[in-house]
C-alpha cells in the first residue's frame, strides 16, 4: 500500500509538471505569433513606401493618381501602428478588433489536459489483504506496567487421598475332616494290637487319652491330626490293653491346621489306610459310608480352602 501511494504521488507530480510546461509553451507560442503579425503589417507598409515612383516619361491618368493619393495616407517612418480607423475597410470594426485583442491578453492560456494513464483496478478479492502496521501508533503507545496484585492467594489445602485398605478376605469357617476305620462286620479291634499299629504309624498317646500325630516323630512338634475311639467318650484305656476293644476308630484333621493342610490330609488318609489294612478293617467317610474317590475329591476341595 505504501509503494502504491508513492507511485501515484510521483505520477501526479509528473502530470502537473507536464501541464505547467505545456501551458507555458502554448502562451509563448501565442505571444510570438502576435508579434509576427505586427511585423508583417509594418513590413507591408514599408514595402508600400519603398515602391518606386513612376517615371516622368510614363504618363498616367491624373484622375487615378489623384484618387490614390487622396485615399491613402503615407505612413511615417516610425514604428507606430497604422491608424486603422482611416481605412475604409476597417471602418466601424476597429473597436471590435481592439476589444478582441484586449480580451485575448486577459484570457489565460488554455491548458490542454493530457490523459493520465491509470493503472488497471484490481478487485479486492484478487489482492491479498496484508495487515497494515501503523508505526506512529506503535511509537506513541507507552508501555503500561501493571502493579502486582497485593491479594495474597488463599493457602491450598493438600488433597488427602484416602488410603485404600486392602480388602479383608474373611477367613473360612473352621472345619474338621473325619475318616473312620471300622472292623469287618461285627468284629472289634483288640486294644494291644490296635495300639501297636497306631504307634508304628507315628502316632503317640497323649492329651485327652487319645493318639496324636505331631509334625515330628519325636512328639515335640505341633499336633497335625489325632485318632480317637469311635465309641463315646472317645478316649482309649491303654493300661487295660488286653481287656480293651472297640468296633472302630476315627481319624480327624481340624482346619485350619499347623503346616500345609493338603499335605496333612494326605498323611492322615495314608495312615488310616495302613491301619485298616493291618487290622483288617474298612475305611469309611464321616457318615460311616465307604470312602469313595469322589468323597476323597470332596475332602480335597474342603482342604484347599485352607491352603496358603
From Swiss-Prot:
Single GO BP term: division septum assembly
Superkingdom field: Bacteria
Residue ranges crossing the lipid bilayer per the database entry: 6-26
Subcellular location: Cell inner membrane
Periplasmic side: 1-5
Region feature Disordered, mapped onto this chain: 43-90
UniProt-listed SUPFAM superfamilies: Cell-division protein ZipA, C-terminal domain
Keywords: Cell cycle, Cell division, Cell inner membrane, Cell membrane, Membrane, Transmembrane, Transmembrane helix
Biased composition regions of type Basic and acidic residues, renumbered to the chain: 59-82
GO CC terms of this entry: cell division site; plasma membrane
Topology of the protein relative to the lipid bilayer: Single-pass type I membrane protein
Matching InterPro entries: Cell_div_ZipA, ZipA_FtsZ-bd_C, ZipA_FtsZ-bd_C_sf
SMART domains xrefs: ZipA_C
Residue intervals annotated with topology Cytoplasmic: 27-308
Disulfide bonds: none
Family: Belongs to the ZipA family.
Function (record text): Essential cell division protein that stabilizes the FtsZ protofilaments by cross-linking them and that serves as a cytoplasmic membrane anchor for the Z ring. Also required for the recruitment to the septal ring of downstream cell division proteins.
Subunit-level organization: Interacts with FtsZ via their C-terminal domains.
Protein name: Cell division protein ZipA
Lineage, opening ranks: Bacteria, Pseudomonadati, Pseudomonadota, Gammaproteobacteria, Vibrionales
